[in-house]
């Protein structure tokens, strides 16, 4: 919804989360198994720590029993991050998003003597032990630490990484003002958190793949007819992309290709699987390009989607609504902090898009015709710097940028892994054109 520039559709989601967090989030945080947290000092009516393991209904009510999943509040918080990143709405940040995310993080990383936090530090790293990643804890009952149930699940590690990075970013930008010791705690946990779990496939042997958790180790692929939890580190955890370290990106690509997620069809993972395909894909040089992804996606659509566009998978309601993210990300990606134009689209196939919304509150349009990217236009809503990968990688020199009919200075900046990026300053409300 956000990348489609239809963020208003998500408007009803946020009050549901905020109402329950304010009403019961602190109670659950103080009562949670192995993770009691009686933190005070919350903002805007929010408890000092928030935690919930159930499905929520409007008006601060629950609509199901305890599912045991400790990551639910983290999961819910990701949409708050996405809404702010795509809009740069500082009122939403300070009044709604930051108070919630700060309280959710407190349950995990701690908030003083009355809230030690769920994570444990062992051998110099913070570990997540027994958070019951799957509904009902069918991986094993709740058990006292250090019983290794669900050790460092990909879901919790990735979601916590994304949450902490966001909190640190908005603090360093001066948009929020956490106490110095709290900011230091976030930075320490992020720097020393257990990594995304990676292991080896049973077949073919010695093939690195993403795992759903460090332990217990499942035979890969992890689940059939179920939700492949290892994908969540890619999306919506957003911790793996084309600029990730080669070893991690290779493991992610192997995971996508080996998991065979359409045979059998997965339980309720449509909205995670295909964005993950796209975000670790490539336009040339690997199997994960748009042609492969669209063919694979069409198998699921033909088998399980009705004439009204509703995908008949496990779960209920909007659990399986998520195909638009995958399609948009084939044309434009920005979750890594910079723009990528047609990141998985074969250059031999024409394509175009108009006013997709990118991180940084940019509205972006472009076309690909005859193997050449043209008509790149960026509307800046918030006046932030715009950083991008040149879609003319074989052209020497800086791309040209103009705004209001005048040239705009473009600077070369180093991206992750030595990636070459370009950056220019923007003014809020101004339209910019990028050309070779």
Give names to the regions the model predicted.
Residues 72, 124, 156, 232, ...:
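Residues that flank catalytic or metal-binding motifs in active/ligand-binding sites
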Residues 1-32, 36-38, 51-90, 95-99, ...:
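Active-site core of glycosidic bond-cleaving carbohydrate-active enzymes
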Residues 284-436:
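Non-catalytic C-terminal accessory modules of carbohydrate-active enzymes
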Residues 65-67, 149, 224-225, 354-358:
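Short Gly/Pro-enriched turn/cap motifs at secondary-structure boundaries
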Residues 114-135, 215, 316, 340-354:
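Short, surface-exposed recognition loops and adjoining beta-strand edges that mediate ligand/DNA contacts
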Residues 98-102, 106, 325, 364:
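Short alpha-helical basic/polar micro-motif
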Residues 42-49, 98, 105, 124-127, ...:
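Beta-sheet entry/capping signal
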Residues 103-170:
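Acidic/histidine-rich catalytic neighborhood
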